[in-house]
Swiss-Prot record:
It is found in: Cell membrane. It comes from Kocuria rhizophila (strain ATCC 9341 / DSM 348 / NBRC 103217 / DC2201). NCBIfam families: lepA (TIGR01393), small_GTP (TIGR00231). The lineage of its organism: Bacteria, Bacillati, Actinomycetota, Actinomycetes, Micrococcales. One of its GO terms (cellular component) is plasma membrane. Keywords: Cell membrane, GTP-binding, Hydrolase, Membrane, Nucleotide-binding, Protein biosynthesis. The gene is lepA. It is an enzyme of class 3 (hydrolase). One of its GO terms (molecular function) is GTPase activity. This is Elongation factor 4. The keyword Ribosomal protein does not apply. HAMAP family: LepA (MF_00071). It catalyses: GTP + H2O = GDP + phosphate + H(+).
Amino acid sequence: MSPLAVNPPAPASTDPSVIRNFCIIAHIDHGKSTLADRMLQATGVVTPRQMKAQYLDRMDIERERGITIKSQAVRMPWNVDGTDYALNMIDTPGHVDFTYEVSRSLAACEATILLVDAAQGIEAQTLANLYLAIENDLTIIPVLNKIDLPAAQPEKYAAELANLIGVEPEEVLKVSGKTGEGVEELLERIVRDVPPPQGVKDAPSRAMIFDSVYDTYRGVVTYVRVVDGTLVPRERIQMMSTGATHELLEIGVISPEPIPSKGLSVGEVGYLITGVKDVRQSRVGDTVTNQQKPAQESLGGYEDPKPMVFSGLFPVEGSDYPVLRDALEKLQLNDAALVYEPETSAALGFGFRCGFLGLLHLEITRDRLEREFNLDLISTAPSVSYNVTLEDHSEVEVTNPSEFPEGRILEIREPMVSATILVPSEFIGAVMELSQSKRGEMKGMDYLSEDRVELRYRLPLAEIVFDFFDQLKSKTRGYASLDWKADGEQAADLVKVDILLQGEQVDAFSAITHKDKAYSYGVLMTGKLQKLIPRQQYEVPIQAAIGSRIIARENIRAIRKDVLSKCYGGDISRKRKLLEKQKEGKKRMKMVGRVEVPQEAFVAALSSDEDNGKDKKK
């Protein structure tokens, strides 16, 4: 067994040859955070008394859902053959929505641990992240986790993993994040196999930002990996993408609580505090350099996060609008990918149109708004961004059905995605049928082993954001896994379906759908609303329309008061007079009456698909 480090290398004066930077990539629920916990314990940076499960997942929502949303970086000392090493572990998010954060975390490392659950095998996101690691030329250490599970098949999956990355099955390490078995061997393997960082100590300083979090007391805490040169406290630094300059108030390492140091040198991973209050000023992927002696070239790879899915968020109580605005401002401090703008809806009042990276991002943001700020929210059906070309060749970007231009449209282009689906071979037929029903185009198919298949499809993003994942899981008994990335645009035959209540359009229920699906959407919504809207004194038609053409209709039957109850026998003309009078009254009421859609009907109509999905996931 390797003893704990005797003299842990001090930050700023650590020789790059004893630094090892690595990250852990895995599919959701394959045990990344649990393995990280065991490493923290084995290296002694967290005492048994301080230890708690998922130590690095700081947000309640991360711990509750068992997912990692924000990257974390921890410095751990470890001794091998009498030499003290500094291991920097970067814990990465595993979900498809946060692929950009994962790619930046990978760029900050020299190696990655490819972690696979010994009971489930390789999943789609494991593959996607593995390809990212290969693109970044990282050393890959294959590891099977959860070997203590009764259902574990370490031999079978070790062969599958070895086959995938081209090593011998004996080279695949077997560990248990729960019991700690094999963790010390893994730490020694990291020291032995991971190359030390390369960089020029005397060159102008360059450091890459791979994450930033907002701290209420200290402002933005930026996580960086130094590539060249040295960063020291009190120097003025410059962000290379924006040119903004700041004073470095504090610099240090996280082990696993922040420890200020005299600086950070080549290959080291740590944090900076500049007193900035907005995460958007220290963007993930940007390069930090010295203002006096700036580097000529940035480290590259920086992209602005681009929202893919749009949804309207409205407070159930209209008076909560200012609270929602403040809450979104605070969340944006911690989440540079969240964009929002004010929106008004005739039906739902004042709210915000928000842009998200994907459905999980939307769900987490909504959860955090409701939980941390005590808000009750209605979210409209998720939509994507369409590019519409009109006949005069002007272009309009549409993120909301209400912005859809009426009139002469030349072409509508919708965003497309490349999807990778991993499924057991017996479900191939069901998955192909589902993908084709969602307008998917098959790009290829590979057998990873006798019973696991990788299917590649090109699909419209709009078909994926609604309930594709839920349907995929239910058709494959939960065994399929999905990963996707943006893949350009494509012209499509799309129409806007409006829902009319007594001839008046209700903007919250409008949707942009493919022409072939417009009828089924119309029938679905009219049927749903017929059950949800209370009956009135007069008959109310609910119609679905494309432009001026009605494609579906349901009626809410009128409540009829028995006006003849007080007539005991008597003349028929008396009864007829009362009935005519009632008929006139209903006619007049129908002309002046307005149908109020109750709040519950909005919530049920807009979120029932989503809730069904949630039930399926449980």
